[in-house]
């Protein structure tokens, strides 16, 4: 519910998540109020591969699997492994970038970290974001897992996907896409 309110750009939700953050982090997170997402919650566990949330906006869309734990590392096995495999399948099938949002409990500041699920080559804006958003790290055996320390802080993710289109970086990215 917390992440849903933030991505939907609800000021109360953004404020609740950034309450113990420094002013710079808070300002980056507040950008979502200007460029919010329509966030749809999947009923129950959702359709296999659709994630817990679907964040939609005119220019971009992400299926998001939400996890939270007291431990900084979360290993995928059983049902969580099946969910991961389904996210890969749907991401490839629909040319989407599935994400994991991982919250570390009892952490001050930005407690959320964002990871992307590798689905191969993506085009347009998603292709550019692929280079910026970290992929799930791999164990020594080569199996993906969630390591909170290696994820992208939520405020950085918001700053990345909610920049105003007048921002020079986005204009140059759009020009590169069109050429």
Task: Pin down the residues of each PLM region.
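Acidic-basic catalytic patches of nuclease active cores, encompassing PD-(D/E)XK
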Residues: 1-44
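Active-site beta-strand-loop-beta-strand hairpin of nuclease catalytic cores
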Residues: 46-65
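A short acidic (Asp/Glu
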Residues: 51, 75, 110-114
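Short beta-strand segments enriched in hydrophobic/aromatic residues
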Residues: 57, 68, 102-105
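Short beta-strand-loop-alpha-helix junction that forms the active-site gateway
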Residues: 66-78
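Short acidic (Asp/Glu) patches
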Residues: 80-86
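Nucleic-acid nuclease catalytic cores
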Residues: 88-122
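Intrinsically disordered, low-complexity terminal regions enriched in charged/polar residues
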Residues: 110-179
